[in-house]
Amino acid sequence: MKVILTSDVDKLGKAGEMVNAKTGFARNFLLPNKLAVQATKENIKIWEEKQAELRAIERENIKKANELKEKIENTKVKIIAKTGEGDRLFGSITSMDIEKALKEQHGLDVDKKKIEMKDNIKSLGTFNVVVKVYPDINANLEVIVDKE
């Protein structure tokens, strides 16, 4: 029996997918628990319209992500930090510091969780940091750490 899933179902599919399910499983579990709707002509038409809307939204999100990627890659973030002997930093520069500097210096709002660093920055110099803008879209940001 063809059904359109309204929720994620283990070993069957994700919400919004049209799948073939065994008749008994669909009638006794999926439909009564509102995990799926039967794939009638009317429901298929509604499902196709929703899929078209989702694809349009996805294209718009990708377009915005690419614009943000361009902005990030065309900017440099300069962070001033206190240093001790041998130009070693007191503390370190974290993704939160980079997020704050991006917002203050360029007005770009990027979540600190999307800024990927192998380790915190602990010395002066220029560093490249990866910013995950969208799934499969990454931007390279140049971070310049200078002493006070």
From Swiss-Prot:
For this protein, the record's Pfam families field holds: Ribosomal_L9_C, Ribosomal_L9_N
GO CC, alphabetical: ribonucleoprotein complex; ribosome
Cite the GO molecular-function annotations of the record: rRNA binding; structural constituent of ribosome
Keywords for this protein: Ribonucleoprotein, Ribosomal protein, RNA-binding, rRNA-binding
The family database entries (PROSITE patterns) matched by this protein are listed as: RIBOSOMAL_L9
GO BP terms, alphabetized:
translation
- Show the Gene3D superfamilies listed in the entry: Ribosomal protein L9, C-terminal domain, Ribosomal protein L9, N-terminal domain
Superkingdom per UniProt: Bacteria
Please describe what this protein does.
Binds to the 23S rRNA.
Q: Which family does it belong to?
A: Belongs to the bacterial ribosomal protein bL9 family.
Q: What is this protein called?
A: Large ribosomal subunit protein bL9
Origin species, per record, is Finegoldia magna (strain ATCC 29328 / DSM 20472 / WAL 2508)
Q: What is the lineage of its organism?
A: Bacteria, Bacillati, Bacillota, Tissierellia, Tissierellales
